[in-house]
């Protein structure tokens, strides 16, 4: 199990990313638009820098929904490999069959 504080921190970051997504996208579009003047683009960059750091999607970490484990994360199931194995062996994941060859 991951520390509760790190899981909660990541949840807070996810909330901030969602909250500032529109504003961040607009400012990035202005900053990257080469038809605008350099002053306008620079102003957009400054406003972008004023946004909270944790509102950047880069700062999010994919974590297991069950254990909070940050590594060995499968995007399709939003779980770590360990949780997938445990739930799969119990038959709790529909369509998941143990492989044998």
UniProtKB/Swiss-Prot annotation:
One Gene Ontology cellular component: small ribosomal subunit
PROSITE patterns, per the entry: RIBOSOMAL_S14 (PS00527)
InterPro entries, per the entry: Ribosomal_uS14, Ribosomal_uS14_bac/plastid, Ribosomal_uS14_CS
Record keywords, A-Z: Ribonucleoprotein, Ribosomal protein, RNA-binding, rRNA-binding
One BP term from GO: translation
Cystine pairs: none
Alphabetized GO MF terms: rRNA binding; structural constituent of ribosome
Physiological role: Binds 16S rRNA, required for the assembly of 30S particles and may also be responsible for determining the conformation of the 16S rRNA at the A site.
Homology family: Belongs to the universal ribosomal protein uS14 family.
Subunit structure: Part of the 30S ribosomal subunit. Contacts proteins S3 and S10.
Classification via HAMAP family: Ribosomal_uS14_1
NCBIfam families in alphabetical order: PRK08881.1 (NF006477)
Identification of the protein by name: Small ribosomal subunit protein uS14
UniProt source species: Beijerinckia indica subsp. indica (strain ATCC 9039 / DSM 1715 / NCIMB 8712)
Encoding gene per record: rpsN
């Amino acid at each position: 199990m991951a520390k509760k504080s790190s899981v909660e921190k990541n949840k807070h970051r996810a909330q901030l990313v969602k909250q500032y997504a529109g504003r961040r996208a607009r400012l990035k579009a202005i900053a990257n638009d080469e038809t605008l003047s350099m002053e306008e683009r620079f102003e957009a960059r400054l406003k972008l820098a004023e946004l909270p750091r944790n509102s950047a999607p880069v700062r999010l970490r994919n974590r297991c929904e069950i254990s909070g484990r940050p590594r060995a994360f499968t995007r399709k199931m939003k779980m770590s490999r360990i949780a997938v194995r445990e739930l799969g062996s119990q038959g709790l994941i529909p369509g998941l069959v143990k492989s044998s060859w």
